[in-house]
Amino acid sequence: MIVPNLITTLDGKEVMVDFFTAEVTQNRTIHIIGEINDDTASYICSEIRYLSRNSKEPLTLILNSPGGSISAGMAIYDTLNASRCEVTTVVEGMAASMAAFLATCAATKGRRFCQPNAEIMVHQPLGGVQGQASDISIAADHINSTKRKMTKIFADSVNLEESKIKALTDRDTWLSAEDALKMGFVDHVGDPMDD
């Protein structure tokens, strides 16, 4: 990925930084682009902690991601909740799987945005395991527990019954920005800069 550099002022000095660093330090905006994995979660959680340690001003999370690891996504979700900052989420391109969870569930109610041509995709947790029958059974119990937990969080965030979330996530369900708005996955179609 090519990231442009900017000349900006940090701590009273002109410095050259990449665009994403400037977004974090000046606008309190964090970007999740690409797969959500342990490395990206570590980086994103560090940015959230840094920003929330210095101020309780609102944060913006911009997502264009196919999703990724449940544990990495939950680390970001928990860190955002612990920050006690108001969180705005903006879907650009797509937010699928764990990215859809973050776009919908990690934001402050009323602050969930989806660009007009962006899409959201939800589905049940994915997993794979091999080994002895007892190990496979333990793994199945774990993924079912994770599914129940995520279904409840989604239902609370979207204000739909858990049975409706279960039906939507049984298979891949793609939502246009307008459909996501109608179903309560986002609060606005457009950009928060337009507000």
Regions found by a protein language model. Name each.
Residues 1-195:
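Terminal-region recognition feature
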